[in-house]
A protein has these predicted regions:
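N-terminal-proximal low-complexity accessory segments that begin disordered
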Residues: 2-52
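Conserved N-proximal alpha/beta basic substrate-recognition cap immediately N-terminal to
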Residues: 32-42, 54-169
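Glycine-rich phosphate-binding loop of ATP-grasp-fold ATP-dependent ligases
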Residues: 158, 177-203, 230, 253-272
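ATP-grasp fold ATP-binding core
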Residues: 171-193, 212-225, 325
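Phosphate-binding site of ATP-dependent enzymes
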Residues: 203-258, 309-323
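A long amphipathic alpha-helix within ATP-dependent nucleotide-binding catalytic cores
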Residues: 214, 243, 255-318, 356-383
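Glycine-rich phosphate/pyrophosphate-binding beta-alpha loops
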Residues: 252, 323-337
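Peripheral (often C-terminal) accessory segments that flank ATP-dependent C-N-forming ligase machineries
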Residues: 345-406
Length: 406
């Protein structure tokens, strides 16, 4: 997928809040910590051959790898901190610290590991990365993409409000419904929907709390969404941004990721609206690539995704929002792209699913039931049909990541 350096991956979901706080000793919220624990082996499926994954819980990891067919088993090592500290730099060469998302806290964790003797190269944190992660960057990118694609329907660029009064002014002069977002958030977090121009007391308290913590909130009209999709990219940090693939995905009503489609890229493109099956798709890809080259190409090095959507206009016609969100990190969409390329049979279609269970034990029971109900079938070294877990599932697990292929 990328460069000559071997990498040490680490799964740290929800890193945007850590970027916003900007502290090396930041502690993620409980849900992010639990997801990081339960899905920590997920980088197996997008890491390159010879890479390693830094895991905390070794119990079950080796058994999970042993349970995979040899032809499907990634050539990637799962290593705990003690094992990493025993590696020899002379033999191994330094491993480049590569978290799911760059943030001061995860880089500080890598640095502590390096000081214990692990042969790791830790990139430096830059305040410029914080600026790029702020939603204002996505808003500026939206403006640039719209200028490059005049054939798109006009889209309201998010407005950033520093007071409740500014929010009230916006909702009383524009047409409801609206979406408010905190500046450092993703995947349905930090989002409030206003169904009308009359702000309720709970909504006002949410806005006041967000303003106290972040200083601003963004607001924009809520569109009548009919489909989510994303374009995935890689930036080399020297001004070159390249297209990495298409992701078609599903979300909860509040925007949280639930699953992504798997299969041949041309077949996935065929699932999009008719307006994206012609030349507009290629023009959109080019416009976004050029915008990213100008905006992030010389500052950020790594994978990134741009969330987009198809929506229904008042006259019933379909239109495209070309730049909902900028994700400066690995994404579930990129995981889906790699699973389609490496794991799923080219003649099959399926879904990557992320599920959260209410209590310990529920995830294991669901995993066992799915394994019995949809046994995996393989052809030509690929998953042709059935269920495949992407991570170990233990009695303590709450989160699952898995594939269902038909």
């Amino acid at each position: 997928m990328r460069t000559s350096s071997k990498r040490l991956h680490r799964f740290n979901p929800g890193h945007e809040a850590a970027v916003g706080i900007g502290q090396a000793n930041y502690t993620p919220d409980a849900a992010s910590r639990r997801m990081a624990d339960d899905l920590e082996t997920l980088p197996l499926w997008y890491a390159d051959s010879g890479d390693s994954v830094w895991i905390t819980h070794t119990e079950g990891a080796d058994q999970f790898l042993d349970s995979l067919p040899l032809f499907l088993r990634p050539d990637v090592r799962l290593l705990a901190a003690d094992a990493l500290c025993r590696l020899s730099a002379d033999v191994e060469g330094p491993l480049l610290a590569t978290p799911w998302g760059l943030s001061p806290d995860v880089l500080a964790a890598f640095e502590r590991l390096r000081r214990r003797g692990a042969p790791i190269l830790v990139p430096a944190w830059s305040d410029a990365l914080r600026t790029l992660t702020h939603r204002q960057t996505a808003a500026r990118c939206l403006e640039r993409v719209l200028r490059r694609l005049p054939e798109l329907q006009p889209i309201a660029v998010p407005r950033f409000c520093a007071s409740v009064g500014e929010v009230v002014d916006y909702v009383t002069t524009c047409q409801a419904p609206f979406i408010l977002k905190t500046p450092f958030s993703c995947s349905g977090r930090g989002i409030l929907t206003l169904e009308n121009a009359s702000i309720t007391d709970p909504e006002r308290r949410w806005i006041e709390g967000a303003l106290r913590r972040w200083g601003v909130v963004s607001i924009e009209p809520k569109l009548d969404k009919t489909a989510d999709f994303a374009l995935e990219f890689h930036s080399d940090g020297h001004g070159c941004v390249t297209y990495a693939g298409l992701s078609v995905f599903d979300t909860h009503p509040r925007g949280a990721f639930t699953g992504a489609r798997l299969g041949d890229p041309n077949r996935l493109r065929g699932q999009l609206s008719d307006i994206l099956r012609g030349p507009l798709f290629d023009r959109l890809r080019t416009a976004v690539t050029d915008t990213l080259c100008d905006t992030v190409g010389r500052i950020y090095s790594g994978f990134l995704g741009v969330d987009m959507l198809v929506y229904r206009r008042l006259d019933g016609s379909a239109a495209v929002h070309p730049f909902i969100e900028l994700n400066l990190r690995y994404t579930m969409g990129l995981v889906a792209v790699e699973l389609s390329r490496r794991v799923v049979h080219p003649d099959a279609i399926g879904r990557l699913l992320i599920a959260r269970c209410p209590a310990p034990g529920d995830a294991l029971r669901a995993h066992q039931a799915d394994s019995r109900r949809f046994p995996a079938r393989f052809a030509d070294g690929r998953l042709r049909a059935g269920y495949l877990s992407l991570v170990p599932v233990t009695p303590a697990s709450l989160f699952r990541a898995f594939i269902e292929v038909v």
